[in-house]
Amino acid sequence: MKKIFDIFKIKKEERVSALVALIIACALNALTVIKYHSQFSQITDNYHKLFVKTFHVAGFDPLTYSIVSHWDTEYNVYRHPLLAFFMYIPNQINQGLIMLTGINCVQFVVGAILVFCAFYSFIFLYRIFREVIGTERFDANLLSAFYFSFAYVMVSAMVPDHFIMSMIILLCTLYITGVCMKKGRQLTIWQTILLFVFTAGVSLNNGLKTYLAALFTNGRKFFSIKYFLIGVILPAALMWGFARWEYRTFVWPKEMARHEAKMKKNKEATAKIYQQYRDSTGVKDSAKVEAAVKKIIKDKAHAKYVRDHKQIWNKNTGKPIAKGEFMNWTDKTTSRSQTLVENFFGESIMLHQQNLLGDVLRNRPVIVKYQSAVNYVVEACIVVLFLLGILAGRKSKFLWLTLTFFLMDAALHIGLGFGINEVYIMTAHYMYALPIAIAFLALKAKGKNLKWVFRGLMLAITLYLWISNGYLLAGYMLG
């Protein structure tokens, strides 16, 4: 057990950087507390309504606030099967604080979780650069600061959604497997199960990344009968079975209750239309009344259809590739080229000044353009550095593991179009591939002059991102 927690010990060379990272993580979360404390410290009987109606930072959901205030399985149980249960102890801590203080302390409880996740994400990324890739200390600090200057890495570290929780587990997975690769060790069954439970428990599709990491680390031994059955098949089956049980136990009864309430409401509304029609027209013939009421209901349905299609949430939702429970989440119509420029490599890294931190389901177009050419130049430089980094590290198995994580998300979001209209909110799931690839370029920058040209460019980009994103983010949260 002691060995498990050794990974959280801060090493001597990490202390100064760790302190800076901790201060920044606390400052980011302080902005969220300042913006919403007056509303979210209230005690209410409907926390879901309060948080969802009030919290507006891009497309992030404040469901964690809701669950930590009043425990329930509010997350989609198939996408986040264990996340609500991970939040049970924070919920109990918050209940104790509510009894002691008389206010809802949810922002402080969740804020502590977010600070922890952001802080150790920085630590694990720094260790990847130093211990796995082998960069110099200066470059490790610079590249870590570069990654945390990304707009939606900063935002993920301060909003009550699951993305920063996924990021710490994914970076921990990469760090552990990277060390195993370097030392010629294999990922054990218990390590695989533990990583899978946390990774898939928070976000089910990320569980596949655990198995990819194990495959890259263990090679052919990944398919040995004992490892594959106990470390792969068993936990995956149990996770899916648990998600199904969770749905039947917690979600299905609520859905049935809502369905029955809706049917009752529709029945009452239809009866009211019948009565109003008879009273206003004096028609007694039941067949004529039936036909007239059907027409009224049809006209109302059509009017609602027209109204809904004028709403921004409908305009910004693309058409699915096919119909189905999961395929309905896909998108075949949103422009991929514009998305790559403005959102995938754009908004994810640099905030747009227009429609700042807007929500595509409320008030933001899917595609927003930068007002200055400088933003596109910076974006192009980052993408070129990323590609050069891939070229420089093309022989590294660890880099290809990281890129597999990246490509898996690219296929999901850009290929299938899952969440493509707000792909930037998923930044924490995959964008760490950029600084990791660029780290291999740092290794290739030999010679004093070339090394400092590289460092100068990275430092300039990092400072620009911190100043630009920090200014816009602080302005939004304090405005």
Q: How would you describe each model-predicted region?
A:
Residues P62-F108, A291-L388, W400-T402:
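Lumenal/periplasmic acceptor-binding loop at the mouth of the active site in multi-pass
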Residues L187-N206, T210-N218, I230-A237, G456-A460:
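Membrane-interface alpha helices of multi-pass inner-membrane proteins
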Residues M158-F163:
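Short acidic/glycine- and proline-prone juxtamembrane loop motifs at membrane-interface regions
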Residues M165-K182:
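Specific aromatic-rich, kink-prone transmembrane helix
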Residues K9-G59, S66-W71, L234-R248, I461-W466:
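Transmembrane signal-anchor helices characteristic of membrane glycosylation enzymes that use polyprenol
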Residues M1-I7, G207-A236, W252-K265:
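Perimembrane helix-loop-helix junctions
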Residues L125-S149, W400, T404:
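Transmembrane-helix signature of polytopic, membrane-embedded enzymes
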Residues A112-I133, V384-L388:
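Transmembrane-helix motifs of polytopic, lipid-linked glycan transferases
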